[in-house]
């Protein structure tokens, strides 16, 4: 293969470079994509399937090598293993960007591998990975409908920025990753700080201009070194099979769609499919089980589309903008800190909010270093939620992706950590699913936060929008069901309040989605959110004013950073003593912010008093409860703060004359003393007598 390099300038100082022909020459396609000193290598390989399948077997694995930043993993095992959450989310971004660009009925097993080989800590690698994978696909012999590219868009100082640096992202009000072809958008994912629908559209249009530029460069690379596409890998569905199935099911879908309950509908649909397979199977060689099932799915999709297009009626009988019935039960679980049973149609979640100290925070490590997440949402999708038997174990990619979307949606409404110093964990337990369980997680999670007494800024709701695009006829659907997601052209999830958007995610199965269509979808989503928010406010108008009796109490105090070692003590001895004596949990960060959590306010006050005693500075004129450390003929030495000891002269014990100090106090006694002065040697003059009149 010929070595080739292509340069694409997006903005000043941001040039994307594609190289091929030097590395991994036995792969179907391989590209090294780089910007600045962030380099991402991507490869694609395909193998013919032994047995045809009715789905696209695309597998994407993205990995961030720690060697890319000159580090080696700690611990006994030194090689990268189980993917991190960030790697899984990036793998999903690449998959969702590439899948629409691959043809239906592609009978090849396609594997995408993408590795971060060099990371400069400035240029974020995920949009580079999307572009690198697309370029590798473009120059390979794997069939592809169209070339794809991806970018990240930020909103910094009221200006749109393409592929913002890490520093820019830290202050950006939006994070948007989008992918598309030269003429259309295929995938978007992002979150923002209550930006308007108009601003989101503006960001998408801004990003798409740069996507088009990158797509043209990838096409240039394809023309120079691209392999001939393997058209034999695409096995189209014979028209005879489709027409025969269409004729057989004519009139049967009307009866099928009278069944509104999901499980009953699926059972009847499978029975009808079975009848079709039994009738046509082996009628001739083109009537395979796979072909018949594919034709049945297409016929079902065509009928659903025609029903919407011609009668404005959906498969479950709803109108285009109708949202399924919603029921809400807050404080659903008696011993949790906050909970909510949220049901929308046949989609349901039990959302739970748990409050804790910093020790409960989620710790993680990636190429940008170690981090601590004090808010996180975990999404659980057990097989019983769809009436199936399945594997239970570590979360799948879908669970992680859905949880992160709901987490981002709610993160923008959380209170200032300085005013509410709790770690917040939400779990969304999906107990029923028929479309849009991630948006149910947003609604249920928000209500669980409010039920727990978290003083959120504003309630947040989420809704999933769908699209039926037939030539020039466009229909936008509110609150799509699982069937509409499966057979429709778009899944557009939007979360926020009535004033702005906090998170969004869109996947498109067809080209032709224009900014006008997206604008209409966002406007319809806003009306849907308003409807859902009104119902949520009826159930719980505002966050509860008091925390649950079962939630820990947390208070913070600030100490000087140079006093941290004093509080911790040698080998942690001092802080362990405070924790044991007061019955609290203590966390101290590098800035000296001390977080104290306990089940009672009294325990917190005791711990604060002990810490203040360790780090406090002595003040002339202040009264201290000191401990008598030793007695001498002329008085007693009293420790007023740890390590700070002064003399209370015999004349300062009482207003009456005393002959023997030992008759007045004993070693170890607690004695109230007032600090009268500090001499030039730093010695403390104490008086018990001065406290008697106060």
UniProtKB/Swiss-Prot annotation:
Catalyzed reactions per annotation: RNA(n+1) + phosphate = RNA(n) + a ribonucleoside 5'-diphosphate
Any GO MF annotation of the entry: RNA binding
Segments forming domain KH: 552-611
Primary location class: cytoplasm
Domain of life where this protein originates: Bacteria
Disulfide bridge positions per record: none
Entries under SUPFAM superfamilies matching the protein: Eukaryotic type KH-domain (KH-domain type I) (SSF54791), Nucleic acid-binding proteins (SSF50249), Polynucleotide phosphorylase/guanosine pentaphosphate synthase (PNPase/GPSI), domain 3 (SSF46915), Ribonuclease PH domain 2-like (SSF55666), Ribosomal protein S5 domain 2-like (SSF54211)
One of the GO BP terms on file: mRNA catabolic process
Record field: transmembrane: none
Compartment annotation: Cytoplasm
Listed Pfam families: KH_1, PNPase, RNase_PH, RNase_PH_C, S1
Family membership noted in the UniProt record: Belongs to the polyribonucleotide nucleotidyltransferase family.
Protein name (database record): Polyribonucleotide nucleotidyltransferase
């Amino acid at each position: 293969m010929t070595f080739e390099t292509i340069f694409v300038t997006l903005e000043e100082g941001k040039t994307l470079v594609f190289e091929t022909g030097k590395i991994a020459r036995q792969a179907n396609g391989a590209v090294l994509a780089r910007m600045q000193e962030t380099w991402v290598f991507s490869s694609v390989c395909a193998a013919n399937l032994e047995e045809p399948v009715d789905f696209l077997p695309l597998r994407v694995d993205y990995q961030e090598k720690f060697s890319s930043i000159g580090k080696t993993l700690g611990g006994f095992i030194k090689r990268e293993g189980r993917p991190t959450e960030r790697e899984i989310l990036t793998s999903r971004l690449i998959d969702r960007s590439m899948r629409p660009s691959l043809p239906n009925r592609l009978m090849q097993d396609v594997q995408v591998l993408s590795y971060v080989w060099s990371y400069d800590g400035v240029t974020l690698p995920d949009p580079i990975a999307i572009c690198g994978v697309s370029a590798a696909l473009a120059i390979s012999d794997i069939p592809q409908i169209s070339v794809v590219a991806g970018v990240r868009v930020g909103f910094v100082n009221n200006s749109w920025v393409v592929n913002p640096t890490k520093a820019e992202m830290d202050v950006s009000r939006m994070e948007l990753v989008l992918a598309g072809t030269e003429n259309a958008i295929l995938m978007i994912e992002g979150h923002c700080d209550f930006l308007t629908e108009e601003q989101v559209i503006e960001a998408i249009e801004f990003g798409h201009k740069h996507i088009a530029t990158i797509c043209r460069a990838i096409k240039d690379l394809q023309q120079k070194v691209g392999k001939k596409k393997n058209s034999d890998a695409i096995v189209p569905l014979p028209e005879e099979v489709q027409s025969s199935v269409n004729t057989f099911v004519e009139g049967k879908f009307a009866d099928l769609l009278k069944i509104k309950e999901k499980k009953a509908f699926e059972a009847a649909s499978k029975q009808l499919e079975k009848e079709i397979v039994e009738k046509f199977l082996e009628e001739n060689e083109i009537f395979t089980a796979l072909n018949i099932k594919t034709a049945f799915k297409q016929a079902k999709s065509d009928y659903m589309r025609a029903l919407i297009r011609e009668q404005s009626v959906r498969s479950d009988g709803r109108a285009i903008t109708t949202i399924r019935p919603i029921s809400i039960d807050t404080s659903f679980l008696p011993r949790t800190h906050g909970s909510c049973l949220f049901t929308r149609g046949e989609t349901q979640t039990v959302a739970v909010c748990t409050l804790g100290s910093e020790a409960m925070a989620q710790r993680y490590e990636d190429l940008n270093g170690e981090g601590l997440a004090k808010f996180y949402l975990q999404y659980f999708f057990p097989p019983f939620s769809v009436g199936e038997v399945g594997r239970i174990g570590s979360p799948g990619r879908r669970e992680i992706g859905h949880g992160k979307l709901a987490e981002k949606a709610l993160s923008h409404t959380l209170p200032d950590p300085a005013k509410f110093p709790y770690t917040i964990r939400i779990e969304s337990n999906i107990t029923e699913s028929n479309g849009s369980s991630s948006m149910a997680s947003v609604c249920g999670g928000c209500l669980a936060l409010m039920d727990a007494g978290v003083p959120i800024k504003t309630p947040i709701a989420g809704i999933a929008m769908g699209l039926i695009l037939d030539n020039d006829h466009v229909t936008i659907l509110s609150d799509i069901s699982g069937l509409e997601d499966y057979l429709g052209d778009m899944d557009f999830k939007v979360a926020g309040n009535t004033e702005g958007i906090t998170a969004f995610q869109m996947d498109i199965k067809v080209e032709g989605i224009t900014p006008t269509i997206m604008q209409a979808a966002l406007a319809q989503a806003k009306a849907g959110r308003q409807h859902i928010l009104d119902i949520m406010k009826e159930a719980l108008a505002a966050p509860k004013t008091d925390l649950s009796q079962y939630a820990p109490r947390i208070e913070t105090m600030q100490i000087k950073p140079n006093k941290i070692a004093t509080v911790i003590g040698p080998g942690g001895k001092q802080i362990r003593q405070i924790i044991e004596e007061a019955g609290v949990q203590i966390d101290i960060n590098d800035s000296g912010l001390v977080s104290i959590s306990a089940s009672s306010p009294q325990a917190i006050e005791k711990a604060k008093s002990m810490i203040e005693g360790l780090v406090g500075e002595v003040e002339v004129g202040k009264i201290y409860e000191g401990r008598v450390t030793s007695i001498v003929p002329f008085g007693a030495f009293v420790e007023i703060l740890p390590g700070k000891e002064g003399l209370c002269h015999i004349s300062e014990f009482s207003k009456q004359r005393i002959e023997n100090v030992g008759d007045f106090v004993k070693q170890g006694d607690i004695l109230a003393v007032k600090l009268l002065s500090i001499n030039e040697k730093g010695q403390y003059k104490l008086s018990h007598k001065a406290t008697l009149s106060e």
